[in-house]
Each structure stands twice: as C-alpha cells, then as structure tokens.
Amino acid sequence: MSEAENKLPFIPEEWSNAASSVSCSSLQPVIALVCGPKNSGKSTFSRNLVEVLLQRYKRVAYLDTDVGQPEFTAPGFLSLTIVDKSILESDWTVPCVKTPERCFFYGDVSSKRDPKAYLRYVYTLFDYYQLHFCKSSENKTELPLVINTPGWVKGIGYELLVDVLRYVSPSHVVKINISAYNKNLPAGLFWLDGNDDETAHLIEIQSAYQDRYNQSILIHKDARLMRDMRIIAYFRQCFKGKEVNTIKELTHELASHIPYEVPISSLTINHLHCQIPSSEVYYSLNASIVGLGISTEVFEDLPSCVGLGIVRGIDTERGILYVITPVPENLVEKVDLLLQGYIQLPTCLLEVKDYRSPYLSANVLAST
C-alpha cells in the first residue's frame, strides 16, 4: 500500500452505503445532518459524505457547527464552506483549512458559554445557504448541504442539537452510535414531537471500530491538541511558498514577519462573552488571537468575520496595533471590528527554546 493510501481513513461498508443512500436520494435539496457522541467519527463520515456527493454534484455546501473542532477553519468559528474538489485526497494527518463562503467568530470552543448567540449564528448561516444556494432560480443551482455537529449530546448540548434539527428540517439525519449505549442519542426521530408533521430519512450507523486489517481504529482525540493544530495550520498560511515544517520555524517566522499596522482609532473592540475594564483593554489584546470583522458587510444584522489575527504588539503612543494575519491586504483594509474571545495562542508557540521572539516567547528574568 502506498504512503498516500495509508493517510486515507478506512470507510466501513455500512458508512459507504449510508453515504450512497444520501447521494442517490431523489429529495431536493439534499440536506444531511450528521450527529452522534464525541469520538464517534462524525467528521470522518461527513468528509466522506462530501466526497461521495461530489461524484454527483459539482459543489457541496458544508455547514460546520462544531466550534471546538471545526473541519475547515480555526477553532471558535461557525462557518459555511463551499467545497468544489476532493478533500479525501488531502493528507488526513494535516488539518484542511479553506476560506469559508460565510463565517462568524463565536470566540469559544464550546456553545455552553452563550447558547443563544451560538444558535443565532447557526440559523443565520443556514438562512444564508437557503438564500444563495438553495432556492431555485434561473441563476442558481441547488447545492446539497452537509451539516457537521458537535459531540456534546447531553444536557444543553442535546437541547441545542434538537433546536438546530427543528430549524433546518434536514432531508436526511445520519446518527452514529457507539458501544457505550448510555452516551448515544435517543432512538428514532428524537427531535420531533407528536405534533410535528415534518419527517426525515433517519440513517443509523455504528462507529467504525476496526480497519481493513481488523485492527482497532477508535482514537480518543486530544481536543486541545487538535485545536492547537488547527490554529497552527491557519497561521501557517501567512507563509505560503516557504518551508515551515516545525513549531520552532513557525515561531521564528511569526516573530520576524512584518505585521500590519492598524490604527486603533479605526477599530471597534468587541469583547465576546465578557466585560473588560477600559483600563485593561490594551493589556488584554496584547499577544492575543482576535477575529477580524467588517461591520459594513452584514447578513441579518451580523457582521462578517474574514479571519483571525495575532496582536503581536501595541504602540499606545502612536495608537497602532501590530497584527499578523493571513487575510489579504484588501480585506484587512476593510476591517473595523476586533472580536476578542477565548481562543488562545497554542502554548507550543510560547515555549520554543533557543529563540527569543517578542510577544511570542516566555522570556522571564531570573530572580536575584
């Protein structure tokens, strides 16, 4: 087996049949929501489903509602991405970063902190999909939609999933079950009550336990590590064309990279989920990850977010923020909102030895 094949996931026959059932459906548009407990394989199945749909459609819409481990963006985002080429051909050991069609910066890795804001973002992204890619007209072609969901399926997480299911009314729901029965979602069309006239094609499959060699493939992901990898993959885009293969190389490049100078007077700073005293605003921004928003580009009164930036330094005398971001200059010039949440720089970028990088290294003077 080739090295490339080794990097592809094993797709069980049951999963292949489920994906084919969705793809071959006569229902239009195809709106497939994938749900199940954490570590059940939702992301893997969703990516495979996109691949199967691309065999029939030129493009597939992907609505990612998992703010902790999103598929195509850095953590903290809710996004709608249009996929027009194979994603299974990419190396599955490396996070796949794509530019979304529309995204919002929620600013945390769990919907627990602000469920109402979370639902509003999800609903707005779905409305955007319906308006631009679903409703039939002479100039529009309906795109199938795959919705990936978080693995938090108990308590508030369960209630949020039910709310999303009722709002989007999917044509297909793929429910992945694991061996720990008490961690699974309820049986049947659990999100519908007796008064609902709507229905959906429910497909229940088992989590993939073994590969083609009958070896266990259950991987308990380190959530923090996965988030750090996605943040690293995102900011590596600042250095396209350069060989940046190690954490040390990335830290060096980030520290030496020429940042954008952004006048503080041109910005509105929005602290998500918390209140920051005015005397500590600059201190809180320094060496932080922020969402870059454009207030003039709104949909349903929500400003768009064009990406993330690292505030590498602040010149309070000149009133300048120094920001590193892979966002193109023509978009950075439009940014007038800084959205600060709880997405943090990976500690590995702060602890690289043998290199002193201002704001990106822990340089502590020894006590005397």
UniProtKB/Swiss-Prot annotation:
One of its GO terms (biological process) is rRNA processing. InterPro entries: Clp1/Grc3, CLP1_P, P-loop_NTPase. This is Polynucleotide 5'-hydroxyl-kinase NOL9. Signal peptide: none annotated. It is an enzyme of class 2 (transferase). The keyword ATP-binding applies. Polynucleotide 5'-kinase involved in rRNA processing. It comes from Arabidopsis thaliana. GO terms for cellular component: nucleolus. Keywords: ATP-binding, Kinase, Nucleotide-binding, Nucleus, rRNA processing, Transferase. GO terms for molecular function: ATP binding; polynucleotide 5'-hydroxyl-kinase activity. Belongs to the Clp1 family. NOL9/GRC3 subfamily. It is found in: Nucleus, Nucleolus. Its EC number is 2.7.1.-. Pfam families: CLP1_P, NOL9_C. ATP binds at G36, P37, K38, N39, S40, G41, K42, S43. Its main location: nucleus. The keyword Methyltransferase does not apply.
